[in-house]
Amino acid sequence: RPGTLSAINDLDSTVRVAWVPRRAGEIGAIEAGLLPQLLPGGRFVDDAKARIDIAAAWGATNLPNQPGLDADGMLAAARAGQLDALVVSGVELADMPDPTGAREAVENCGFVVSVEQRFSEVSARADVVLPVCLLEETSGTFLDWEHRPGRVRVVNKQPATPMNEIRVLDALSAQMGSVSGLATVAQAHKAWKDLGQWQGGHPKMESTPPLVPQAPMV
């Protein structure tokens, strides 16, 4: 829950703490730059050298030096009409801290793309639904809580070229006039390895207030 890590850190800063995530893909997502203040590989977005490294890898002239929006920020912006579109993949609105607000955000957003394996609340409200294959139908890599890589075991090899999230994002990028160069899992994995290990600074621990849960529905 939000605030747990801050509470542990406040109790005793000398204690070594390890985070074992609930979902298999969370460590890899953070390493890929999921958090609004991070670039891939744990590079901080306001670090000039980090931005130069990533801009060079992506073939970009420059990158913004301000953090992006987290999930709550994106949903709030969508509710306020400040986002033109949302691309939502594998998110259950009922799992969000504010399910009602999340539903309002999706319903109020001008254009919603749902990338899904199965029917969901988001796909029911989406303008475009792009189905993707199951986990066991495509290759890939997970990082465990110790950052050790583990390959995904492909069980169903029937589709020769499964429509996975990589292909969907590459296609969307192409339609928007940008060439990602990441049309396959192998290309994405190579791009990740080519970035190398970040040798610069890392973000400092900031305090996060605890989440006050909503009253249960009766």
Predicted regions and their residues:
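Long, compositionally biased stretches
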Residues: 198-218
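Non-catalytic alpha/beta scaffold blocks inside enzyme catalytic domains
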Residues: 1-203
